[in-house]
Amino acid sequence: MITVALAKGALLKDSVTRLAQAGLDFSAVLDPTNRLLMVPSACGRAKALLVRNGDVPVYVAYGQAQLGIVGFDVLSEKQMPVANLVDLGFCGCRMSVAVKATSGYRSAVELPPHCRVASKFTSCARQFFEDIDLPVELVHLTGSVELGPLTGIAEAIVDLVATGRTLRENGLIEIDQLFYSTARLIAHPLSLRLDNGRLQEIIEIMQSSKDSSAQ
């Protein structure tokens, strides 16, 4: 039986749609009355694990799920040993550096050395600032990261940005982009090597459906 790790929240609906195109019907997870965290597919040949976004690559890396769908932001932050197979293209957003609009900074390299940068994505932030050779002090926050520059706890933030509305409403602007994040299909590497063909079939269908939607 194939097990697929699915993230609760923004990725879930599109993930279910894409998997249905590959013959895995997990529409039951979208039922608002559903309280199950392990949900069988309609055909009974697969099951879905409903987990937090950040836990998807963990379940896949440890082999408790053969496949998973997760944002590239989480993959980059977690750095788990999984196979990143298909860019599914939905739920796109930017991982950006932002500062107060009144700060005068217009590029990350203009930030002062050893300034504080707040983020939920400290691994991504650390790699970015190392790449531009700017030493910073990272402050790990788990929510409302925009408050960092407003309260003075940090000079800048690194966070996901979709429309930019929240930044604008809080007087912040983007000054650099780390990468563009979209949903990715990932797999457990050993499961891929031992695959009898079923996993590869799902992967190929999801790749082709992504290519078709892009045309």
Curated annotation (Swiss-Prot):
Pathway: Amino-acid biosynthesis; L-histidine biosynthesis; L-histidine from 5-phospho-alpha-D-ribose 1-diphosphate: step 1/9
Keyword Signal found: no
Subcellular location(s) per record: Cytoplasm
Coiled-coil spans in chain: none
GO biological process, one term: L-histidine biosynthetic process
Protein EC: 2.4.2.17
Tagged with keyword Glycosyltransferase: yes
Keywords per UniProt: Amino-acid biosynthesis, ATP-binding, Cytoplasm, Glycosyltransferase, Histidine biosynthesis, Nucleotide-binding, Transferase
Reactions catalysed, as given in the entry: 1-(5-phospho-beta-D-ribosyl)-ATP + diphosphate = 5-phospho-alpha-D-ribose 1-diphosphate + ATP
GO molecular function: ATP binding; ATP phosphoribosyltransferase activity
Matching InterPro entries: ATP_PRibTrfase_cat (IPR013820), ATP_PRibTrfase_CS (IPR018198), ATP_PRibTrfase_HisG (IPR001348), ATP_PRibTrfase_HisG_short (IPR024893)
Entry GO terms, CC: cytoplasm
PROSITE patterns cross-referenced by the UniProt entry: ATP_P_PHORIBOSYLTR
Domain of life: Bacteria
SUPFAM superfamilies: Periplasmic binding protein-like II
Function: Catalyzes the condensation of ATP and 5-phosphoribose 1-diphosphate to form N'-(5'-phosphoribosyl)-ATP (PR-ATP). Has a crucial role in the pathway because the rate of histidine biosynthesis seems to be controlled primarily by regulation of HisG enzymatic activity.
Quaternary structure note: Heteromultimer composed of HisG and HisZ subunits.
Family statement drawn from the similarity comment of this UniProt entry: Belongs to the ATP phosphoribosyltransferase family. Short subfamily.
Domain-level remarks: Lacks the C-terminal regulatory region which is replaced by HisZ.
Protein known as: ATP phosphoribosyltransferase
